[in-house]
Amino acid sequence: KTDETARKAYYTINSSTGSSNSGIIEENEPQNMVTYFENQLILAESAARNGSLADGLPYLNNVRAWMNTGGHINSNFQDQSYSYLAYDAADFDNGGIENTDGIDSKSAFLREVIEERYVSGFGMHIPYNDSRRLRKSDSSIAVPYVLVNGPQSGPWPERMPYATTELNSNSNAPAEDPGIFTKTRVNQ
């Protein structure tokens, strides 16, 4: 049901030179703050958590239908193969294509939504926020968060750093940056 050849190429970064990158970090590629896919995946997760897999599935399939138009990649990768066919509830049943480890169907669905948020949110704040949120309450469906050249068991980054301009000009900002490892109130 899924062919991610084009997305993989779009996300591949040539670290030896900046000028040859024509995908996610191409110099004119938009860096979105809020997106259609993010909103649909929020709706998918919340509908499933507050109801059932069947309640969330249409929202996930909306994202897949949009991706099947090539909306998630730029024109440099439209000629590469991609396919995002709609899921059905059986795909999340024990032994289904999205549940090879036999967890309950709803958890398998939520895990797929979180994985899609992780991949689609590449370069955005979504994976970072999901990592903090799910580590506390739903580690069984969280995407493993690996720090390159960093500790694998903590401390984990808890917040984004404050910009110096924010600290200097915003009267609501703390007197000094507390650092990325200081837990926010919601994560204590």
Which residue ranges define each predicted feature?
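Acidic/polar-rich alpha-helix caps and helix-coil junctions
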Residues: K1-Q188
